[in-house]
From Swiss-Prot:
Reactions mediated catalytically: Eliminative cleavage of (1->4)-alpha-D-galacturonan to give oligosaccharides with 4-deoxy-alpha-D-galact-4-enuronosyl groups at their non-reducing ends
A molecular function GO annotation: pectate lyase activity
This protein's encoding gene: pelA
Binding site for Ca(2+): 174, 176, 216, 220
Pfam families: Pectate_lyase_4
Cofactor note: Binds 1 Ca(2+) ion per subunit.
EC number(s) from the headed UniProt entry: 4.2.2.2
One GO CC term, this protein: extracellular region
Cofactor(s) named in the record: Ca(2+)
Protein name: Pectate lyase A
Function: Involved in maceration and soft-rotting of plant tissue.
Keywords: Calcium, Disulfide bond, Lyase, Metal-binding, Repeat, Secreted, Signal
Protein's pathway: Glycan metabolism; pectin degradation; 2-dehydro-3-deoxy-D-gluconate from pectin: step 2/5
Disulfide bonds: 330-358
Length: 393
């Protein structure tokens, strides 16, 4: 049963009014409950791009009739039907986006697996086991969607049931775990875990002599989206991690947009794109990157990919990459037609690293918000790791 949680004290104390309200809610199949945690009312922190040129409050202004507890996909989509009204949706347990019915082909998966999150919404997991499987959360600005908060949930990356074949590039999957697209803006992602989970890349089969790839991105931000903060989150066991700006020719939509802050996140056993950026301006500080250049499944390739007109300011990050020597430190940043990258105060395998000689021009844009980069130490890296991801809010 989907519960519409009150989350507010009543303005009148009349027992009669309270009894009438509860009776009406029970008659409609919805029972009254309390807002489980005031953390659902929190706005994005002032640190990060989501605080700029406006605010990111999600569903904090929700009235009592737009606060929900949901336990399955039917209840979740019903709660989302409130549209742009402020709403808080509390996730209890596992939401199987497929509803337990396997996808039959590309068209079926496209129709049922992509869940659009409307404006003025907070989605927050309850406890330590809130989870989405077999689908994607989409924040799509086509209809003006903005002001969205996603917190304390685990998302298992979707498995494409019918990948498409591209000559020269092999089999490619379509679906991301999360996608912020088409001009969506003011989005805060916090204490979220995204992982390949129980279907890792070594479980791929082959088809027509080539690897049958069934995972795409973990969290992509593209097509003119803007003012995004990602904090205290974990991306674990994945290849194509985070694409910011989807291609080199989309300057009309992307130029001057795609401002993204990443802080206090952990990227564990991710192969690449943490992130790869075109056109965007990325601030990445006090994040932890863990990998192995000889990992048999998720072989570390690079963290920051600098694409066309993209720029990254990296500060106080920790790179613990097995089988990557200090002499090859520049492998943490890769040039893809881009030229702007700076790093200050980061460490590689426990020692200070100098990335100034990696062939990039300095990042000179002003960061408009006040922030505090903590000196990266082994203890800080462990603290960030211990705090990152779902179930730790």
């Amino acid at each position: 049963m989907m519960n519409k949680a009150s989350g507010r004290s009543f303005t009148r104390s009349s027992k009669y009014l309270l009894a009438t309200l509860i009776a009406g809610m029970m008659a409609s199949g919805v029972s009254a409950a309390e807002l489980v945690s005031d953390k659902a009312l929190e706005s994005a922190p002032t640190v990060g791009w989501a605080s700029q040129n406006g605010f990111t409050t999600g569903g904090a202004a929700a009235t009592s009739d737009n606060i929900y507890i949901v336990t399955n996909i039917s209840e979740f989509t019903s709660a989302l039907s409130a549209g742009a009204e402020a709403k808080i949706i509390q996730i209890k347990g596992t939401i199987d986006i497929s509803g337990g019915t396997p996808y039959t082909d590309f068209a079926d998966q496209k129709a049922r697996s992509q869940i659009n999150i409307p404006a003025n919404t907070t989605v927050i997991g309850l406890g330590t086991d809130a989870k989405f499987i077999n689908g994607s959360l989409i924040i799509d600005g086509t209809d003006g969607t903005n002001n969205v908060i996603i917190r304390n949930v685990y998302i298992q990356t979707p498995i494409d049931v019918e990948p498409h074949y591209e000559k020269g590039d092999g089999w490619n999957a379509e679906w991301d775990a999360m996608n912020i697209t088409n001009g969506a803006h003011h989005v805060w992602i916090d204490h979220v875990t995204i992982s390949d989970g129980n279907f890792t890349d070594d479980m791929y089969t082959t088809k027509d002599g080539e690897t049958y790839v069934q995972h795409d991105g973990a969290l992509d931000i593209k097509r003119g989206s803007d003012y995004v903060t990602i904090s205290n989150s974990l991306i674990d066991q994945h290849d194509k991690t985070m694409l910011i700006g989807h291609n080199d020719t989309n300057s009309a939509q992307d130029k001057g947009k795609l401002h993204v802050t990443l802080f206090n996140n952990v990227f564990n056993r991710v192969t690449e794109r943490a992130p790869r950026v075109r056109y965007g301006s990325i601030h990445s500080f006090n994040n932890v990157f863990k990998g192995d250049a000889k990992d048999p499944v998720y072989r570390y390739q690079y963290s920051f990919g600098i694409g066309t007109s993209g720029s990254v300011l990296s500060e106080g990050n920790s790179f613990t990459i097995a089988n990557l020597s200090a002499s090859k430190a520049c492998k943490v940043v890769k040039k893809f037609n881009g030229s702007i990258f700076s790093d200050n105060g980061s460490v590689l395998n426990g020692s200070a690293v100098d990335l100034s000689g990696c062939g990039f021009s300095a990042y000179t844009s002003k960061i408009p918000y006040i922030y505090d980069v903590q000196p990266m130490t082994t203890e800080l890296a462990q603290s960030i790791t211990d705090n990152a991801g779902s179930g730790k809010l």
